[in-house]
Every structure is written in structure tokens, then in C-alpha cells.
Amino acid sequence: MSITGIDSSHVTESQGTLLFNEPLAEYTTWRVGGPAARLYKPANIDDLALFLSRLPFDEPLLWLGLGSNSLIRDGGFSGTVILTQGCLKEMTLLSDNCIRVEAGVSCASMARFSARNNLSGGEFWAGIPGTMGGALRMNAGCHGGETWQSVIEVQTINRRGEIRTRKPEEFEVAYRHVAGLGDEWFISAKLQLSPGNKETSLQLIKDLLAHRAKTQPTNEYNCGSVFRNPPGDFAARLIESCGLKGVSIGGAVVSEKHANFIINHQGTATAANIEALIHLVQTKVREQTSIELIREVHIIGDANVQTR
């Protein structure tokens, strides 16, 4: 079956939902991006495996959770998007201190689930605006916590729909980076946390979210942190020191509240505006400090808007 030959008959035996020419802006926290040629919402992991096994091997694939670490260009994505958020959403307490979580569970939900089960060490996930699949992929963290410090086992799936169980030692884990995944994607993980107190953990989450609201533009469309922190410094400090707070291109604006955030002001920005502002910030910081800011956000898709 060719890529262009994929149609609704492709999911005859599947339980999920296949959409065509689906606008992606509503699936990203920046609220920008053109359409996906196809978007699939799997019913569960087995359904996902079946769907992948029937895809043409050369079909371009994009995995999307909350879309908080992705800039999808205005031309969209000319392949198939696999949506995990709201789909792969199971959380299970396996033992007193071990949780199995699927890739589509939001990090905030995971933080609350662990706290309510009297486990500590996962409160920081409440401050990450993404899914656990994305957190595994980039070793997401904040407030002194990192995702992979709790991982004891992961499940991955490849484009043939084959599922593997893998251990942490099979990966190279670093700051906001995980190597060794190859042509696979995370679909679940077993996480080991420490015994704790529900009330203490829930209060910590409440305090963390209050701090986040005070220091980050949580009431504006954004993707989270745009750049990684360079060794020994902070991206936000460098951007602010270069006088870039409030700088804008179209509806894309460097946040006055936190310089490592670019906001889509009142939903008026295009992906092209945001991408241009990212490059401008990198250029100005490089020129003034000789430091190269590395993007944390992934830029995906076609730059040119196409008629489909």
C-alpha cells in the first residue's frame, strides 16, 4: 500500500480513530501549525501495534503528546501523526513504590497520582507541560528532579508494531537528552519512587504550581522552555541580558515574565513568526555573548503552506 493509498479502510480492524487533513494547531500548546495528512488516535497499545504493523514502511511518522515541546510549521506534516495524549493513558500502582505509566499520561496527572498513593519524588512532574512519553524522550525535569532518575524499565515500539522491554542501562541519559532509542518510541515505563506522605506531596505540588504561575507566562500560549540552559548559566538570563524581553516578530513575543519563553500573543502568531524569533534570539545571544543557545523545542514539518 502506498502512502497516498492510506484511507479509512486501513483501520478496518483497528479500534482507534483515523483523521485526514487534520489541523494540528489545536494539538499543540503554541496553537500554531498546519494540517497533518493523517492523524491516528490509538485505542490502546495493542491497537497502536496493529496500526503501525499495517503502515507502509516508508510512511513519515510524528509522535505527538501535548505538543508542548514542538513547533509544527505552517505547512503541516505530510505523513501520519500518532497522538498519544488522551489515548495511551493508563496508570497502575504495581507495588507500594512502583508505578506503570503509559506515554500519553500528562506529567501533571502522574505527579498527582504518585502523591495520592503516598509516593514522593515525582512532584516535579507537575511543572512539566507535557506527557510522560515526551518526558522519557528528553529526560524532562525541573526543580531538581529529572524523569530518568525514577525509571526502572521502559516499553518501546518500532514502526513495525513490535514491542520491546528495555532497561535504563541500554540508554545514554543526559541533561534534556536520551540516546539509544533508535527507530523506536516510548509507550510506557515502570517508575520507582520513594515512600512519602500524601498531604506533604500535594502541598509541594500546589506550591510548585503557584511558583510556576508567578514566574512563567502560563496564561499565554507557549511551548515551555525554548532553549536548554548552557553549562553553568541560564538561557533566560542570557536572553534578558541581551535586551530581548518583549522583542516580537508578528504575534510571537519573547515573554516579559520569563525570557526563555516565546508566547503566541492572543493567538495571532504563525509558526513562521515563532521560528524567525527563535533564530533572532539565537543570533543576538551569539553575537553578544559568544554562547550558542541550543533549542529544546523540536521544529517539525513543512515551512510552506500547501493546498491539500
Swiss-Prot record:
Its cofactor is FAD. GO terms for biological process: cell division; cell wall organization; peptidoglycan biosynthetic process; regulation of cell shape. InterPro entries: FAD-bd_PCMH, FAD-bd_PCMH-like_sf, FAD-bd_PCMH_sub1, FAD-bd_PCMH_sub2, MurB, MurB_C, MurB_C_sf, Oxid_FAD_bind_N. It is found in: Cytoplasm. Coiled coil: none annotated. It catalyses: UDP-N-acetyl-alpha-D-muramate + NADP(+) = UDP-N-acetyl-3-O-(1-carboxyvinyl)-alpha-D-glucosamine + NADPH + H(+). Its main location: cytoplasm. Residues 32-196 form the FAD-binding PCMH-type domain. The active site is at residues 176, 225, 296. The keyword Lipoprotein does not apply. GO terms for cellular component: cytosol. Pathway: Cell wall biogenesis; peptidoglycan biosynthesis. GO terms for molecular function: FAD binding; UDP-N-acetylmuramate dehydrogenase activity. SUPFAM superfamilies: FAD-binding/transporter-associated domain-like (SSF56176), Uridine diphospho-N-Acetylenolpyruvylglucosamine reductase, MurB, C-terminal domain (SSF56194). Transmembrane segments: none annotated. Belongs to the MurB family. Cell wall formation. This is UDP-N-acetylenolpyruvoylglucosamine reductase. It comes from Legionella pneumophila (strain Lens).
